[in-house]
Structure formats: C-alpha cells, structure tokens
C-alpha cells in the first residue's frame, strides 16, 4: 500500500480531507514539528541542507558562465564594453515570427538573444577574464565544486558522518572558523586573485596557470613585505590616463589608497579594492583567533554576555541568559542571520551604484537599475523573514526563567512603550508627509505652483558637505580645505575622493532638494510602519491583554472562535502577512525614487525630477505614466519590437497581482460553499461522475487562502515592476 503524503506526519496522512495536501505543503519545512524529530536530527538535517543549497548556487553560477561562453558575445564585448550589448543566452521560441527573430537578434550575433542586465560581464572582465575559454574553465570548476558539495551533503546524513549536538552548539569554534575561514581566508584569497591575476590583466599582462608562478605581481616581489617597507607596494599607481586592459598609463602599485574612480572605467581602482580585501582579511583572521576553544585561552562568549550587566541596574540582568537562549534556539539564530544579511544586502544595493567596483558598469544604466532594484527587494524579504523567525522564537523557544529580567524580558515588559512610540512616529510621518504632498498637489492643480511648501534638506546637505561636496557652500570638514579632516588625508586618498564626489559623472552623493526631502520622509513612513507591524507581531506573539494565552495557539491561527470574537488577525503570522504588503510598498517607493532620480540625472535633465517630484500627480504622470510608454508599445496593431517580452511580462504581472485580491478579499465560507456546489454538480454529471477522488474537498483555511493571495500579490508586484525598470531604462538609453 502506498504511503500517503505527507510521510513526516501520520496525523495529516490519515486526514480524509484535501487539507491533508495543503497542510502537508505548509508544514514541509517546519522540520521541528515532524514525527519523531529529535533536536540532534533537526540540526543534522538543516546542516546537510546547507550543502544542497550551496550546490544549487554553484550550479546556477556555472550555468551563467557556460551559457555566456556558448551563446554569448563576451570576447566581442571585451573589445568594446561601452557599445556592445552583453548577451545572457540565445532564445529559441516556436512562437517567434520573422519580426520577433529580427527584433531579438542583437549584440553582433545572427540569432535571437536575451541581453544580460546582471552585470556579470563587467564582473568577469574586471577580475581578469578575457576569453570564452576562461568562462568554460570557470563553469567546469564550479560544476565540480557543486558536485562535491552535493556529495558532502549526502555524506553528512550518513550515520558515521553525522555531527553530534555538542558539535553544533560549540559556538566559539564555529565563530572562530567562520571569522577566520569564511571571511578572513576567503578575503585573503580574493585579494590574492586581484593582485596576481586581475590587476596585471588590467595592465595588459595576461596571467594564467602556465605563468602564474613565474611572474611577479610587483617588481620588488616579497622583499618589501619581509623588510617592513610596505609603502613600496603603493608607489607608482596607475595614472589618470591609464587605458584599462592595456599597459598605457599603467603603474606597478598593487596596494593603494587613491580614493575615487578610475577616469576611464568610472569604477573604483582595483589596487584600492585589493588593499581593502587584504585589510579585511587581516582583521577577520585575527578576530577568528579570539575565542576560547582547546587551550583555555581567549574569550568565552558566555562570560562576555554574562558580564554585560550595566552597573546602575537600568537594564536589569543585562545579557545574562542570552548565551543559552541563542544557543538553544535555531529561530533566534536564523532571525539574527536574516537581519544581518538583510542590512548587508540593502547596503550592497546602495554601494553598487554609488561606488561601482566593476569596470564600465557605471555606464550600463539598465544593469545599474536592475541590480539596485534586485538587491533592495531581496533585502526587504530578508528583513521581514528576520522578524517572522523572531516571532516564532518568542512563541516556541523563549524561556521566561532563563531570561528573567534580562534585555529580552525587559523588551517584553516595555512593549507598550515601544509599540506606542513606533505608532506615534508612523502617524507623524504619514500625516505630515502626505499633508505636504497633497498641499503641493492642490497648489499645482489650482494654478499656484509657487505656493508649494518646499523644504531644503539642510541636514542631509550638511552631511554631504562634511563628506566633501562643495556645491552647497557649507565649508565644513572635507568640504573645507583647511579643516583637520582635510589636512590629515590630503596626501593619501582625499584628492581622488574630492574629484569623484564633486564630479557630475557618477552617482556619488547626488545633489538633493525638496523632492528628495519629501520622498525620504515617505520612505521613512513605510519603514517605520513596516517595523511597527513586525515588532508588534513579535512582542505580542506570546500574549496580549486581549489574548493572554496566545502562545498556546502557536505562530499562526485564524481566530479563537466566537467566544473570543476579537481574536481574528492577531497571530504573529498575521503581523508578518500585513507587514509584507507594507514592505513591498516601501521598497517600491525606494526603487521609484532611485530610478526616477537616475533617469533624469543620466539624461542630463535633473530639473525634471526636481520640478515634478514635489507633488503626487508628478510621480504618477511624469514617472510612472511617462516611462510606461515602451511597455505599452512593446507590441501593438502595427507590430512589435525588442521590448515586447517586457511589455508582455508587464501585462501578466498585473494579472497575477490582481488575482491575489480574489483570495485576499473573499474568505473561507465562500470557497467552502462553492466547492460543495461544484462537488454536487460533478456527482450528477454523466461521464464526469466516473472520476472520483479519495479526499473530501475542503476549502483552504483563512491563513492558507491569505498566503495564496499574498503569494500572487508579491509575484505579480515584482513581475510588474521588474519589466518596467528594464524596459523604461532600455527605451531611454539603449
């Protein structure tokens, strides 16, 4: 007899209704709820899955390299990075007519292709790759690594090679290895690659395995390192006239602190980047030897945390209990990891355009826009996930005795103050920002645009001036040539930095005005409201005045019946659900702002943003509507063009998004009645009633239907905005 799905839960497998399938899918990854799951087995399964995850990532990157080498135009692109469009892969589609084949045949090849907007060409070029053979070698290497990781994942599930629970909870050893190995040694290896391969390649010197050991990356070799004369490595850097990829204007320095950008590529100096990674390596390798393991020397994490008790008693027991709490809670660990990675991903989005590290990418506007949008959306998902697992921690793992009067307990005790302050900030930001926008709309609508309320963002301008931007005339710190900050760094990195920050050729500290001030506060509203919902969801996850026993109902529950009718929508899951909508809206405001600002800056018409961004109709008309032209006209009665695929995606993105509302607005009873009516009709329809099913059809629960609605809303949201960003930018600058 075949075992019914799901195998991990006998109770669900024996459920006679279709909820068996839906609850099975819903709890497939809730490993700790599975039958017979022990703590040790849980850790082992998660550990093994990490290898599978890494294998998938490396297989995917191997596929990128392979398809570009096979179907792309990397070697042609290398010869002219500013003019040749980089190809991701070829397209074969039976729907393509002659006009489509013609429209999608570009990039100097004779077959239809997709253009790459991920920046991989710029990355591979910058790190020293030049030929398709290089790409094939990379693809093969990653394929081998992927296979090795898959084997390692399988191996660590075998009884002999399963680590024990003590190994997983050995925090100091894990921290040492991750700091030294993961961050330190990998940074050292990367700086080594830059020094030995990428920097010589940028100077026209081809280094591969055949001459790797016989070619010195610096004329003095290791002598300056062993004699302590490290400054030699910074002498004779590339000149401002250096032609990237050639020896013309090239220097010999390998570790510099020039600041600013390479004039031709508009990317950071490779020698600065190598220096950065070497410094990171030293710091992290040192940090990875600080924690106590085998020899009883170094820091004990528990001792450090237990000692963190402020003397005046304002934080009670301080960090006591946190070591045990974090060690024993995977949800707490995951929450902290997701929050850290979320912040890092958002920072990547900000830095990739402001301080581009890849040659010529600053001039590939479509790639710049795609990468910014991509990283900000991912950051949003990671941050919401962090709070979701924080809430699950409070429901499942939080022990009041272990955490008695420590910072966690005091967060729970002060939750009313925390939540009400966040609420006040959100209300203040919302009413004032919207009030200003609407006032300005009224003024423009009634023919008195000069009466708009326009605030100059003086504090932000002051910060820009402190970093060296001279335009505002503040004459402070780095924008003052006589300040201590300027004098201290004037001989090192400051000349390059000052040239960059005051140049109109990059996105470093863009000039800001009233439109930026308003949208900044609109984004602040979104961030604070999302945070309010998530923080409230986590802090109220164990219980509230309305429902003190909430933790007994678990992370997600629809309602606690008619007896306590006010208990709908108050589970921690509901907070996550609501926060997702706010997160998506906030990230869209962030990306709208970034994209519109850059479209006008790149087009040499910054005034268009400055004039139209101070009122809401300006955003709707001059950003969204005006830039949707390539999407609306990708295909029409007269034919199609290369934007047709984005136009089509823009359309079906809207449709998926709209489908979400069907599940979000109609609730369970409607679906149950509909299903029962359909079953009645099916059973009375000749021929159709020959088909029977074992499970009794039952509508999705409220929580599940909301998840289906949210999934459609989210996927549709992204499939609408992604093609908008790519097609509208391509339409202007391709």
Curated annotation (Swiss-Prot):
<protein>
    <recommendedName>
        <fullName>Photosystem I P700 chlorophyll a apoprotein A2</fullName>
        <ecNumber>1.97.1.12</ecNumber>
    </recommendedName>
</protein>
<comment type="function">
    <text>PsaA and PsaB bind P700, the primary electron donor of photosystem I (PSI), as well as the electron acceptors A0, A1 and FX. PSI is a plastocyanin/cytochrome c6-ferredoxin oxidoreductase, converting photonic excitation into a charge separation, which transfers an electron from the donor P700 chlorophyll pair to the spectroscopically characterized acceptors A0, A1, FX, FA and FB in turn. Oxidized P700 is reduced on the lumenal side of the thylakoid membrane by plastocyanin or cytochrome c6.</text>
</comment>
<feature type="binding site">
    <location>
        <position position="670"/>
    </location>
    <ligand>
        <name>chlorophyll a B3</name>
    </ligand>
</feature>
<keyword id="KW-0004">4Fe-4S</keyword>
<keyword id="KW-0560">Oxidoreductase</keyword>
<keyword id="KW-0148">Chlorophyll</keyword>
<dbReference type="InterPro" id="IPR006244">
    <property type="entry name" value="PSI_PsaB"/>
</dbReference>
<keyword id="KW-0793">Thylakoid</keyword>
<feature type="binding site" description="axial binding residue">
    <location>
        <position position="662"/>
    </location>
    <ligand>
        <name>chlorophyll a B3</name>
    </ligand>
</feature>
<feature type="transmembrane region" description="Helical; Name=V">
    <location>
        <begin position="330"/>
        <end position="353"/>
    </location>
</feature>
<keyword id="KW-0603">Photosystem I</keyword>
<keyword id="KW-0813">Transport</keyword>
<dbReference type="Pfam" id="PF00223">
    <property type="entry name" value="PsaA_PsaB"/>
</dbReference>
<dbReference type="GO" id="GO:0015979">
    <property type="term" value="P:photosynthesis"/>
</dbReference>
<feature type="binding site">
    <location>
        <position position="671"/>
    </location>
    <ligand>
        <name>phylloquinone</name>
    </ligand>
</feature>
<keyword id="KW-0157">Chromophore</keyword>
<keyword id="KW-0249">Electron transport</keyword>
<keyword id="KW-0411">Iron-sulfur</keyword>
<feature type="binding site">
    <location>
        <position position="559"/>
    </location>
    <ligand>
        <name>[4Fe-4S] cluster</name>
    </ligand>
</feature>
<dbReference type="GO" id="GO:0009522">
    <property type="term" value="C:photosystem I"/>
</dbReference>
<keyword id="KW-0479">Metal-binding</keyword>
<dbReference type="InterPro" id="IPR020586">
    <property type="entry name" value="PSI_PsaA/B_CS"/>
</dbReference>
<feature type="transmembrane region" description="Helical; Name=VIII">
    <location>
        <begin position="517"/>
        <end position="535"/>
    </location>
</feature>
<keyword id="KW-0460">Magnesium</keyword>
<dbReference type="GO" id="GO:0000287">
    <property type="term" value="F:magnesium ion binding"/>
</dbReference>
<feature type="transmembrane region" description="Helical; Name=I">
    <location>
        <begin position="46"/>
        <end position="69"/>
    </location>
</feature>
<dbReference type="GO" id="GO:0016491">
    <property type="term" value="F:oxidoreductase activity"/>
</dbReference>
<keyword id="KW-0408">Iron</keyword>
<feature type="binding site" description="axial binding residue">
    <location>
        <position position="654"/>
    </location>
    <ligand>
        <name>chlorophyll a B1</name>
    </ligand>
</feature>
<keyword id="KW-0602">Photosynthesis</keyword>
<feature type="transmembrane region" description="Helical; Name=VII">
    <location>
        <begin position="417"/>
        <end position="439"/>
    </location>
</feature>
<feature type="binding site">
    <location>
        <position position="568"/>
    </location>
    <ligand>
        <name>[4Fe-4S] cluster</name>
    </ligand>
</feature>
<comment type="similarity">
    <text>Belongs to the PsaA/PsaB family.</text>
</comment>
<keyword id="KW-1133">Transmembrane helix</keyword>
<dbReference type="InterPro" id="IPR001280">
    <property type="entry name" value="PSI_PsaA/B"/>
</dbReference>
<dbReference type="GO" id="GO:0016168">
    <property type="term" value="F:chlorophyll binding"/>
</dbReference>
<dbReference type="GO" id="GO:0051539">
    <property type="term" value="F:4 iron, 4 sulfur cluster binding"/>
</dbReference>
<keyword id="KW-0150">Chloroplast</keyword>
<feature type="transmembrane region" description="Helical; Name=IX">
    <location>
        <begin position="575"/>
        <end position="596"/>
    </location>
</feature>
<feature type="transmembrane region" description="Helical; Name=III">
    <location>
        <begin position="175"/>
        <end position="199"/>
    </location>
</feature>
<feature type="transmembrane region" description="Helical; Name=XI">
    <location>
        <begin position="707"/>
        <end position="727"/>
    </location>
</feature>
<keyword id="KW-0812">Transmembrane</keyword>
């Amino acid at each position: 007899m075949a075992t019914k799905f799901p195998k991990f839960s006998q109770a669900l497998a024996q459920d006679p209704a279709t909820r068996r399938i839906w609850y099975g899918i819903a709890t497939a990854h809730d490993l700790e709820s599975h039958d017979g799951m022990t703590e040790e087995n849980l850790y082992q399964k998660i550990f093994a899955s990490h290898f599978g995850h890494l294998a998938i990532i490396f297989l995917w990157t191997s596929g990128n390299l392979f398809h570009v080498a096979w179907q792309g135009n990397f070697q042609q692109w290398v010869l002219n990075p500013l003019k040749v469009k980089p190809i991701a892969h070829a397209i074969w589609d039976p729907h393509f007519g002659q006009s489509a084949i013609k429209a999608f045949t570009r990039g100097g090849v004779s077959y239809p292709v997709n253009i790459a907007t991920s920046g991989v060409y710029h990355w591979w070029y910058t790190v020293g790759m030049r030929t398709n053979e290089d790409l094939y070698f990379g693809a093969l290497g990653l394929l081998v690594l992927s296979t090795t990781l898959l084997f390692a994942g399988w191996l660590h599930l075998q009884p002999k090679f399963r680590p024990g629970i003590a190994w997983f909870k050995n925090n100091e050893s894990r921290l040492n290895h991750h700091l030294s190995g993961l961050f330190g040694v990998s940074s050292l290896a990367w700086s080594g690659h830059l020094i030995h391969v990428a920097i010589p390649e940028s100077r026209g010197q081809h280094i591969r395995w055949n001459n790797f050991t016989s070619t010195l990356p610096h004329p003095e070799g290791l002598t300056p390192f062993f004699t302590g004369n490290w400054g030699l490595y910074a002498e004779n850097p590339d000149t401002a006239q250096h032609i990237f990829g050639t020896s013309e204007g090239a220097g010999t320095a390998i570790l510099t602190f020039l600041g600013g950008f390479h004039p031709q590529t508009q990317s950071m100096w490779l020698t600065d980047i190598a220096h950065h990674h070497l410094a990171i390596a030293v710091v992290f390798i040192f940090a990875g030897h600080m924690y106590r393991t085998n020899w009883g020397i170094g820091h004990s994490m528990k001792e450090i945390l237990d000692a963190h008790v402020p003397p005046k008693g304002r934080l009670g027991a301080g960090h006591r209990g946190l070591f045990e709490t974090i060690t024993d809670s995977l949800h707490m660990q995951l929450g902290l990891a997701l929050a850290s990675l979320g912040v890092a991903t958002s920072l990547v989005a900000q830095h990739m355009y402001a301080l581009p590290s890849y040659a010529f990418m600053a001039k590939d506007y479509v790639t710049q826009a795609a990468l910014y949008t991509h990283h900000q959306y991912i950051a949003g998902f990671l941050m919401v996930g962090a709070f979701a697992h924080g809430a699950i921690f409070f429901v499942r793992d939080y022990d009041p005795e272990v955490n008695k009067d420590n910072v966690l307990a005091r967060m729970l005790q002060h939750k009313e103050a925390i939540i009400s302050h966040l609420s006040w900030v959100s209300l203040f930001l919302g009413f004032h920002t919207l009030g200003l926008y609407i006032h300005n709309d009224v003024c423009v609508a009634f023919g008195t645009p000069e009466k708009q309320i326009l605030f100059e963002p003086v504090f932000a301008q002051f910060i820009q001036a402190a970093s060296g931007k001279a335009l505002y005339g503040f004459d402070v710190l780095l924008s003052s040539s006589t300040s201590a900050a300027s004098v201290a760094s004037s001989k090192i990195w400051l000349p390059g930095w000052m040239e960059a920050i005051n140049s109109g050729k990059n996105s470093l500290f863009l000039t800001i005005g009233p439109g930026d001030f308003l949208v900044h506060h609109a984004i602040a509203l979104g961030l604070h409201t999302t945070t309010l919902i998530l923080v409230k969801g986590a802090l109220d996850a164990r219980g509230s005045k309305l429902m003190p026993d909430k933790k007994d109902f678990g992370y997600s529950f629809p309602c606690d019946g008619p007896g306590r009718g006010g208990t709908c929508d108050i589970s921690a899951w509901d907070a996550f659900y609501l926060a997702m909508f706010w997160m998506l809206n906030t990230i869209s405001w962030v990306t709208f702002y970034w994209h519109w600002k850059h479209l006008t800056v790149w087009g040499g018409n910054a005034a268009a943003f400055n004039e139209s961004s101070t009122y809401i109709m300006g955003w709707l008309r001059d950003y969204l509507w005006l830039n949707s032209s390539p999407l609306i006209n990708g295909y029409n009665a007269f034919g199609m063009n290369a934007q047709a695929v984005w136009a089509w995606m823009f359309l079906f993105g809207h449709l998926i998004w709209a489908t979400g509302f069907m599940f979000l607005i109609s609730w369970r009873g409607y679906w149950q009645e509909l299903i029962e009516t359909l079953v009645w009709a099916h059973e009375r329809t000749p021929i159709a009633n020959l088909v029977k099913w074992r499970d009794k059809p039952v509508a999705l629960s409220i929580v599940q239907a909301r998840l289906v609605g949210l999934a459609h809303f989210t996927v549709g949201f992204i499939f609408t905005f992604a093609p908008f960003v790519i097609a509208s930018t391509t339409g202007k600058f391709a």
